[in-house]
Amino acid sequence: MDLSGVKKKSLLGVKENNKKSSTRAPSPTKRKDRSDEKSKDRSKDKGTTKESSEKDRGRDKTRKRRSASSGSSSTRSRSSSTSSSGSSTSTGSSSGSSSSSASSRSGSSSTSRSSSSSSSSGSPSPSRRRHDNRRRSRSKSKPPKRDEKERKRRSPSPKPTKVHIGRLTRNVTKDHIMEIFSTYGKIKMIDMPVERMHPHLSKGYAYVEFENPDEAEKALKHMDGGQIDGQEITATAVLAPWPRPPPRRFSPPRRMLPPPPMWRRSPPRMRRRSRSPRRRSPVRRRSRSPGRRRHRSRSSSNSSR
């Protein structure tokens, strides 16, 4: 009896120990699953930390390269983006998770594209700057060259020696103008047009030509706004006419044909007349028919006689 009781106690103890061991230590398959999950989480964390660190490094590098040289920034950013994508793919393959590698590739490619686009848009290449500067310099330098050429072509304008005097009364004559304007210098010519119907009356204006332009300037200064016969007059300078170029413009009018003579105008009238007999031809046929009848009637009458 004692042995059976001892055996029962020992069996009960073994069962309790098995229960404790089952509660304390999980199965080896569960341990493996948990270890795999932990390793995946660690690899994901490592991949994200590496991506963030690589992005920060890439941004710092691009900023430094932009300040150093704008032309080499685009090429270097491309190389950094390719290296970052290669490192991200290596981390993804080591971890064995396809989702993390795809996300790292897309992130690195987007960052590299944004950095390259910002660098290209923000700072233009030095070649473009030089080209723009050349264009601006050329556009600025062209107008003064044209002005210089025009100045060389243009001769200095001669000073006027002729003065136009307006708003004269009809009582003023050439002698009066000669007396007044001879005080300012030697007068070369006085032109005072007269009305056709009343030759003793002037049209109200005159031209006075001096020998020197300085004398004409004196007359303009003193007599513009002065009074003659109780009325204010106007004195203005008359510019000398420019020498005209040789008459090349007269060639087109010479090419114009003169009006045709009378004998050339007659043929179209003859043509018009030629159309009219065709219209009158049936009328003539009708007119001939009664004559024939008359002849026949006469012949018949003669035969009867």
From Swiss-Prot:
Keywords on record: Acetylation, Cytoplasm, Isopeptide bond, mRNA processing, mRNA splicing, Nonsense-mediated mRNA decay, Nucleus, Phosphoprotein, RNA-binding, Ubl conjugation
Segments of this protein annotated with the region Necessary for interaction with PNN and exon-skipping: 156-242
Region (Necessary for interactions with UPF2 and UPF3B and UPF2-dependent NMD), start-end ranges: 69-121
Cellular localisation: Nucleus; Nucleus speckle; Cytoplasm
Region Necessary for interaction with SRP54, nuclear localization and exon-skipping: start-end pairs: 1-161
Lineage, broadest ranks: Eukaryota, Metazoa, Chordata, Craniata, Vertebrata
Composition bias type Basic residues, residue spans: 1-10, 127-143, 151-167, 266-298
Keyword Acetylation in record: yes
Subunit structure: Found in mRNA splicing-dependent exon junction complexes (EJC). Found in a post-splicing complex with NXF1, RBM8A, UPF1, UPF2, UPF3A, UPF3B and RNPS1. Component of the heterotrimeric ASAP (apoptosis- and splicing-associated protein) and PSAP complexes consisting of RNPS1, SAP18 and either ACIN1 or PNN, respectively; the ASAP and PSAP complexes probably are formed mutually exclusive. Component of the active spliceosome. Associates with polysomes. Interacts with the cleaved p110 isoform of CDC2L1, CSNK2A1, PNN, SART3, SRP54, SRRM1 and TRA2B/SFRS10.
Organism of this sequence: Rattus norvegicus (Rat)
Glycyl lysine isopeptide (Lys-Gly) (interchain with G-Cter in SUMO2) crosslink, residue number(s): K7, K15
Domain text: The RRM domain is required for the formation of the ASAP complex.
Name used for this protein in its record: RNA-binding protein with serine-rich domain 1
Primary gene name: Rnps1
Ranges annotated as biased composition (Basic and acidic residues): 33-59
GO biological process: mRNA splicing, via spliceosome; negative regulation of mRNA splicing, via spliceosome; nuclear-transcribed mRNA catabolic process, nonsense-mediated decay; positive regulation of apoptotic process; regulation of alternative mRNA splicing, via spliceosome
Chain segments carrying region Disordered: 1-170, 240-305
PROSITE patterns: RRM
Task performed by this protein: Part of pre- and post-splicing multiprotein mRNP complexes. Auxiliary component of the splicing-dependent multiprotein exon junction complex (EJC) deposited at splice junction on mRNAs. The EJC is a dynamic structure consisting of core proteins and several peripheral nuclear and cytoplasmic associated factors that join the complex only transiently either during EJC assembly or during subsequent mRNA metabolism.
